[in-house]
């Protein structure tokens, strides 16, 4: 394990004190988002059953030179509970709405697990707003297991 990811025997998912938490009305729902830093924006999209808290160790590093935006995806974490709108194209519009509310025209997008689907939809729908796209723990469509 990388030393900056470890905080003794358990992971530390606490954001630095310089981050602020905000609820943003976007695309017909309310999205909870953590924001910190200054510089080029990076949007961090979490996986299924997780929240933006999963990004705290990475965010603590990125905030030194970037504006970090870590939302809780629609209906998860501290975002408003909802019963609909979970298709990835719609959630991509949630991300666009958050960026609009923060006056962020573009940025790098880093995603994990189900956040990859939202990130891919966002990049497809808003290609001019994505400066870089990083997708982690993502199966590649059309490529099966080796063997």
Annotate each language-model stretch with its function:
Residues 128-144:
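A conserved short beta-strand
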Residues 15, 24-27, 34-36, 70-112, ...:
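Active-site loop/oxyanion-hole signature of alpha/beta-hydrolase fold enzymes
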Residues 44-45, 110-111, 134-137:
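Short beta-strand segments
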Residues 1-41, 64-66, 104-105:
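Alpha/beta-hydrolase fold catalytic core
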Residues 29-81:
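Conserved HGGG/HGGXW glycine-rich cap/lid loop of the alpha/beta-hydrolase fold
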Residues 111, 115, 119:
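Gly/Ala-rich beta-loop-alpha elbow adjacent to hydrolase catalytic centers
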Residues 67, 106, 129-132:
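Residues at the starts of beta-strands that form the adenosine-phosphate
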């Amino acid at each position: 394990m990388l030393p900056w990811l470890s905080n003794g025997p358990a992971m530390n998912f606490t954001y630095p004190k310089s981050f602020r938490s905000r609820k943003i009305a976007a695309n017909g729902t309310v999205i909870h988002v953590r924001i910190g830093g200054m510089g080029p924006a990076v949007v961090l999209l979490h996986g299924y059953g997780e929240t933006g808290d999963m990004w705290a160790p990475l965010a603590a590093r990125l905030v030194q030179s970037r504006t970090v935006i870590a939302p809780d995806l629609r209906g998860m974490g501290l975002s408003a509970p909802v019963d609909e709108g979970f298709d990835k194209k719609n959630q991509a519009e949630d991300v666009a709405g958050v960026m609009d509310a923060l006056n962020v025209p573009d940025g790098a997008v880093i995603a994990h697990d189900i956040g990859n689907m939202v990130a891919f939809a966002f990049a497809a729908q808003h290609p001019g707003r994505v400066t870089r796209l990083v997708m982690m723990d993502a199966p590649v469509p059309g490529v099966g297991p080796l063997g």
